[in-house]
Structures are given as C-alpha cells and as structure tokens.
A protein has these predicted regions:
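Conserved beta-loop-beta element that borders a ligand/cofactor-binding pocket
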Residues: 143-165
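NAD(P)H-binding glycine-rich loop region in Rossmannoid oxidoreductase-like domains
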Residues: 36-91, 95-99
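Conserved beta-strand positions in the Rossmann-like core of class I SAM-dependent methyltransferases
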Residues: 5, 29, 48
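Conserved catalytic-site region of short-chain dehydrogenase/reductase
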Residues: 77, 111-116, 162-166
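A conserved pocket-lining segment of Rossmann-fold NAD(P)-dependent short-chain dehydrogenase/reductase
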Residues: 173-180
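Conserved Rossmann-fold NAD(P)-dependent oxidoreductase catalytic core, especially the SDR/UDP-sugar
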Residues: 35, 90-133, 147, 155
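N-terminal Rossmann NAD(P)H-binding glycine-rich loop of SDR-like oxidoreductase domains
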Residues: 4-24
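Short, polar loop motifs at secondary-structure junctions
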Residues: 31-37, 161
Length: 180
C-alpha cells in the first residue's frame, strides 16, 4: 500500500487532497495543528497533531516517509500569514530533508504562474488585496528558497488561478478535469 504524509490536511486544499488520497487507497498520515477538524473516518487514515513551527518534532514525524505533501497554510484570515508562511515553509523543507524524505510536493499558489508573457498572476492586478500576503509569501518561498534547493526532489504545485473561493463556501467539488 502506498503511504504518504500530508501536512495541512484539514485546510481547504489539504482536505481535498486527503479525500483524493483516501479514495485512491493510499495510507495517509494527516499532520495537522487541529486534529479535531479532521472528520473523516477511514482505516487508511492516521491523524497526528503537529506544529510545523517545531522543526525537530516535524522531522521526527516525517521519518520513514518517502513522500510528503505539504498543503500547509497558516490561514487566509491570519493577519500574520505572510510572516508565518515564510517562517514555517523553510522548516518543513529542512525537516523533510533531515528525515530522509525522497520527494516533497508543496502546494503553492497560482501567483507565480504567468497569465501572459512576462506577467505573473500576482502582478496582474486581479487578485483580491486580502489574498496578497499569502500569495506573495508562497511566491517568495518558491523563488528565493526552492529554486536553489538541490538536496531533495521537490515539486511546487501551483493550482489553477480559479481554484475556488478559498473555502468561504465550504470545500470545492471534485471535477476530475485536472490531473497531477
């Protein structure tokens, strides 16, 4: 059975990834700050309380996993989303490397995608101002940290710019149109 660690499994994107992994019969260890938010009951699911800001605990939790998916987001309503993202994503990356993880897939943001030649979504003036701190922080982590990373096989997955309403109306609906 395929086994994966999923950081941020209780969030908007993380919960969709969790459901997809379980539907494909993966064994998932969901690593979340608030385990009570995971309502899924599945024999292939283990829920573990993890604070990603505690790099040593995260490293221990990731030992034995070849594959880790991080859908970590400190919360779109968090006034410190920019600072928390830039503080904690390097910790996730470092913990994964030290734990011997083979591949790290990070769910980033659409902000780094080009909407036309030379223009990234973040610079196109179409994203709501409220989203900008989170979008900017993910872009900075990607451009300033991940692009220089060579010690681990990583993927920075940028979802479509029309991913949804960031959970304001609940989880999105699986369409089966996009495949990763």
């Amino acid at each position: 059975m395929k086994k994966v660690a999923l950081i941020g499994a209780s969030g908007y994107v993380g919960s969709a990834i969790l459901n997809e992994l379980l539907s494909r019969e993966y064994q998932v260890e969901a690593m979340v700050k608030h385990p009570e938010k995971i309502k899924t009951d599945n024999p292939n699911l283990i829920v573990k309380k993890i604070d990603v800001s505690d790099k040593k605990s995260l490293e221990e939790a990731l030992k034995g996993f070849e594959y880790v998916i991080s859908a970590y987001n400190p919360g779109w309503a968090n006034t410190r989303i920019y600072e928390d993202t830039l503080a904690n994503y390097p910790k996730i990356l470092d913990a994964a490397k030290k734990a011997g993880v083979k591949r790290l897939l990070i769910v980033g943001g659409a902000g780094t995608l080009f909407v036309e030649p030379g223009v990234r979504l973040i610079d196109a003036g179409i994203l709501p101002d409220a989203w900008m701190p989170g979008v900017k922080s993910l872009g900075e982590f990607y451009l300033n940290t991940l692009l220089n990373e060579s010690e681990i096989d990583w993927v920075f997955f940028s979802p479509a710019g029309n991913l949804g309403d960031m959970g304001a109306k609940g989880p999105g609906k699986r369409t089966g149109i996009y495949r990763l």
